[in-house]
C-alpha cells in the first residue's frame, strides 16, 4: 500500500512539474506538431473586416512539411500572409531561437491554461513577443497572441475535436489590428469605395476571421504538385 501511495504521489508531482515548466509544455506541443507530415481539410471562412464587405465562402486547405501551404477557394478572401496554423508550430520547433517563461495561469473555457511567453533571442526578428495559453491537461494551445513589428498583434482562439492528437483545430478565430495590418491593394480599393464613415485614425479597429475545418485527411503523402497554382 505504501509503495502504491508513493507511486501515485510521484505521478502527481510529475504532472505538476510539467505544467510549471514551459520547456516541458513546448516539448509536448512539438511532439504533436511532428506527428503531422501533411494534411488536407475542407474549409469554411467567415469574415468581419471593418470597411470591407466579404462574403463567407467554402474552400479547402492543404499543408505539407516543412512550409508548403495553400488555400483553395474562389473569390477574394482576407487572411494574414502567414499560415495561421503552421506559423506557430514552425516557430516553436526552433527552440534555439527563443526563451520561454510562464507568466501566470488563467481559466479559458473551463480549462486551466499556463500563459507561456516566447521571447526571441535576436532583437532583429519580425516577432516581438508570442504569448500562448496552453491547456495544462491536454497540452493544446487554446489562445495565442503574436505581436510583430509590422503587423501589430494577431490573436487566435482555437477549438479542438477529434484531431486534437495532432493539435489540429476544428475552429480558429483570428482577430487582427486593422490599423497595422497591410491590406492587399485590391482590398484597399474596396475599402475606399464602400467605407463612407469618417474613421478616427486613433481608433484601433479589429477584424475577425472565423475558420471552420472538417474532413481532415492526415499524412496521405501529398504531392508537391498539389501546391502549384492553376489558372481557371
Where are each of the predicted segments found?
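Sequence/structural signature of outer-membrane beta-barrel proteins
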Residues: 48-50, 179
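Extended lipid/amphipathic-ligand handling interfaces
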Residues: 28, 58-64, 155-164
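A short, Trp-centered hydrophobic/proline-enriched beta-strand micro-motif
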Residues: 33-47
Amino acid at each position: 500500500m505504501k509503495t502504491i501511495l508513493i507511486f501515485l504521489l510521484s505521478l502527481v508531482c510529475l504532472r505538476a512539474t510539467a505544467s510549471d515548466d514551459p520547456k516541458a509544455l513546448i516539448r509536448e506541443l512539438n511532439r504533436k506538431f511532428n506527428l503531422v507530415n501533411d494534411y488536407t481539410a475542407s474549409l469554411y471562412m467567415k469574415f468581419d473586416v471593418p470597411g470591407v464587405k466579404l462574403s463567407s465562402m467554402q474552400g479547402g486547405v492543404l499543408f505539407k512539411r516543412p512550409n508548403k501551404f495553400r488555400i483553395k477557394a474562389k473569390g477574394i478572401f482576407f487572411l494574414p500572409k502567414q499560415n495561421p496554423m503552421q506559423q506557430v508550430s514552425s516557430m516553436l520547433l526552433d527552440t534555439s531561437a527563443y526563451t520561454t517563461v510562464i507568466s501566470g495561469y488563467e481559466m479559458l473555457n473551463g480549462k486551466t491554461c499556463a500563459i507561456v511567453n516566447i521571447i526571441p533571442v535576436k532583437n532583429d526578428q519580425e516577432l516581438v513577443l508570442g504569448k500562448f495559453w496552453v491547456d495544462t491537461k491536454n497540452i493544446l494551445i487554446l489562445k495565442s497572441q503574436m505581436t510583430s513589428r509590422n503587423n501589430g498583434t494577431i490573436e487566435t482562439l482555437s477549438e479542438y475535436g477529434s484531431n486534437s492528437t495532432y493539435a489540429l483545430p476544428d475552429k480558429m478565430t483570428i482577430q487582427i489590428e486593422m490599423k497595422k495590418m497591410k491590406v492587399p491593394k485590391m482590398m484597399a480599393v474596396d475599402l475606399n469605395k464602400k467605407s463612407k464613415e469618417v474613421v478616427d485614425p486613433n481608433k484601433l479597429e479589429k477584424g475577425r476571421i472565423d475558420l471552420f475545418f472538417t474532413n481532415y485527411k492526415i499524412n496521405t503523402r501529398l504531392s508537391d504538385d498539389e501546391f502549384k497554382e492553376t489558372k481557371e
